[in-house]
């Protein structure tokens, strides 16, 4: 939570800058280059985006940016019926046998998670639009 820009929290941004010997600064000043690097290192690589089927990769990545890598990974694992350890590996990737069904089930579960948050009444419409857009784009990518 807290200060966020493009799904990147101040804490994630500060950690990224510290690892590169840079001083912390408000996430509102994040550059596009930093956004791309953080998305790749902090989210895409950690959900094994390069190994997941097209479309599923995007749906899991976007979920990870907004709700954390662990949650996105465990929800994917639940959807495809493997142990939910939060680490996407060969078993998880191999279990994604139907990308369309996986995308739909993952987006449904994501919405279920969001609906149960106490801030859903405030932010729910925006979250629902985002998930709807992610679903549509992921399904288009998968076909």
Task: Please tell me what each predicted stretch does.
Residues 1-143:
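Cell-wall polysaccharide-cleaving catalytic domain and substrate-binding groove, primarily
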């Amino acid at each position: 939570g807290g200060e966020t820009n493009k799904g990147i929290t101040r804490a994630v941004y500060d950690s990224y800058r510290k690892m590169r010997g840079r001083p912390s600064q408000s996430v509102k000043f994040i550059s596009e280059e930093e956004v791309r690097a953080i998305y790749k290192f902090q989210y895409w690589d950690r959900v094994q985006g390069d190994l997941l089927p097209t479309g599923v990769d995007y749906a899991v990545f976007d979920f990870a940016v907004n709700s954390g890598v662990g949650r996105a990974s465990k929800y994917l694992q639940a959807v495809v019926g493997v142990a939910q350890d939060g680490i996407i590996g060969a078993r998880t990737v191999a279990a994604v046998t139907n990308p369309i069904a996986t995308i739909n089930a993952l987006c449904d579960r994501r919405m279920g998670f969001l609906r149960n948050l106490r801030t859903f009444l405030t932010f729910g419409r925006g979250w629902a639009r985002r998930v709807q857009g992610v679903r549509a784009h992921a399904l288009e990518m998968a076909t």
